[in-house]
């Protein structure tokens, strides 16, 4: 998990530079292996990191934290830019939903990224939550370390 997130952050480095952002990856362990579909998790975290960059404030940072426990890994991605209004938080994982103030041509997007992210987390038996206030917007993903990957869990991502 640490390696995957580190690689995704490195790949996104040009985007960080373009937005005048920095990033910080923190983990309580140097390595954590979980049973999961690596391609889907890469898609999930690439989306969350991309959104943190897109909506991050110029000159601020994106903080990625990994908290590994015996049977659960928690990943939080925080940006210190745009605050999502509280009334919009319950809707943010709906397909085609875009936060009203982010619907500009400069940010782009279809409103599918977070819906797909939630489907990926659900397929892995995990949870995804968001909080947003003046202290930052935080997406928190919790995944089981030893998830039973079988065909019933993995369907088509719509």
Question: PLM ranges: what are they?
Answer:
Residues 125-126:
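Conserved glycine-rich
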């Amino acid at each position: 998990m640490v390696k995957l997130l580190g690689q995704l952050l490195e790949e996104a480095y040009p985007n960080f530079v373009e937005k005048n952002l920095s990033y910080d990856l923190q983990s309580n362990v140097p390595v954590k292996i979980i049973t999961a579909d690596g391609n889907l998790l890469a898609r999930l975290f690439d989306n969350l990191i991309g959104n943190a960059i897109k909506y991050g404030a110029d000159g601020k940072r994106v903080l990625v934290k990994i908290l590994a426990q015996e049977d659960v890994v928690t990943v939080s991605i925080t940006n210190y830019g745009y605050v999502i209004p509280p009334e919009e938080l319950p809707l943010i994982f709906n397909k085609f939903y875009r936060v009203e103030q982010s619907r500009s041509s400069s940010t782009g997007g279809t409103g599918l990224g977070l819906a797909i992210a939630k489907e990926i987390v659900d397929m892995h038996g995990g949870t995804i939550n968001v909080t947003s206030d003046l202290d930052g917007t935080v997406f928190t993903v919790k995944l089981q370390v030893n998830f039973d990957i079988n065909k019933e869990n993995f369907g088509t991502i719509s």
